[in-house]
Amino acid sequence: MDVSLLLNVEGVKKTILHGGTGELPNFITGSRVTFHFRTMKCDEERTVIDDSKQVGQPMNIIIGNMFKLEVWETLLTSMRLGEVAEFWCDTIHTGVYPMLSRSLRQVAEGKDPTSWHVHTCGLANMFAYHTLGYEDLDELQKEPQPLIFLIELLQVEAPNEYQRETWNLNNEERMQAVPLLHGEGNRLYKLGRYDQAATKYQEAIVCLRNLQTKEKPWEVEWLKLEKMINTLILNYCQCLLKKEEYYEVLEHTSDILRHHPGIVKAYYMRARAHAEVWNAEEAKADLEKVLELEPSMRKAVLRELRLLESRLADKQEEERQRCRSMLG
């Protein structure tokens, strides 16, 4: 076996089990990548969580399309066709896996993955912990851990090799489509149709990212597109907050802030997501940053801080009540 560390990727180790053929495929933005995967725990039994071959349906993702588990794009773009490789991924990359897995299982069971409802009660409320409907995924969500992904790369299709409406547009048409998609996303959001709104924002982001690949990074035109992309990503995150997809919000907002540390809305959204998953200190730090960068948001920041303190007090009271009941 050929063991190698993926360069410039913290918390990822790769082991090639079967070498692929030819050169690395051209993974351009918009390429559709088809692959089989098996997800395992890092315990002695290498407990299998999901296996696409057992489902009988390979997985596919679109490069640059904000796939929930962003590290998979990194893993796949290191592979050749036919290659089988095992990737150990640290917890920093696997926090959103339970939500992805839930969606994949819902699809495999013939259910609509957007129709599920979040339920909280009793002990679950105490930890602000939402059931995903699968016991093993609930456990993973409560206690994130490193995971192993066994991946077999089957196919890479360029944007013009499969049917995707966005790619039927030329550059000028793509740019014209962006404000229309943005506006439609806003309209759907106001109607409370958050899944559909998120899809519109994603389509607009894909258009812009494709245009951005034609510009020199960090120059004027590239930065103009980057600003538009960040605005749409934050709109997308607003939908995720409504859908209670808090860990994905943390990923997207943190990624924006790594490259653009002055975006106030990203700090504000990340603070709200941190608060929902009981990262109280992180939430407070982000809210303080909002206040530092935008003093005019003082009223909104104080409201969020009061809400956080109230929820923390409720949680502590539930814990006290639980301890009393356990002691009889």
UniProtKB/Swiss-Prot annotation:
Tissue expression notes? Highly expressed in retina.
Q: Does the keyword Membrane apply?
A: no
Q: Where in the cell is it found?
A: Cytoplasm; Nucleus
PPIase FKBP-type domain: residues covered: 53-145
**What does the UniProt keyword field contain?**
Cytoplasm, Nucleus, Repeat, TPR repeat
Task: Please verify whether the record's keywords include Repeat.
Answer: yes
Where are TPR repeat segments found?
A: 178-211, 230-263, 264-297
State a single Gene Ontology molecular function: peptidyl-prolyl cis-trans isomerase activity
Which InterPro entries does the entry link to? AIP/AIPL1/TTC9, PPIase_AIP, PPIase_dom_sf, TPR-like_helical_dom_sf, TPR_rpt
Subunit relationships? Interacts with NUB1.
- Functional note: May be important in protein trafficking and/or protein folding and stabilization.
| Name of protein | Aryl-hydrocarbon-interacting protein-like 1
Q: Which organism is it from?
A: Rattus norvegicus (Rat)
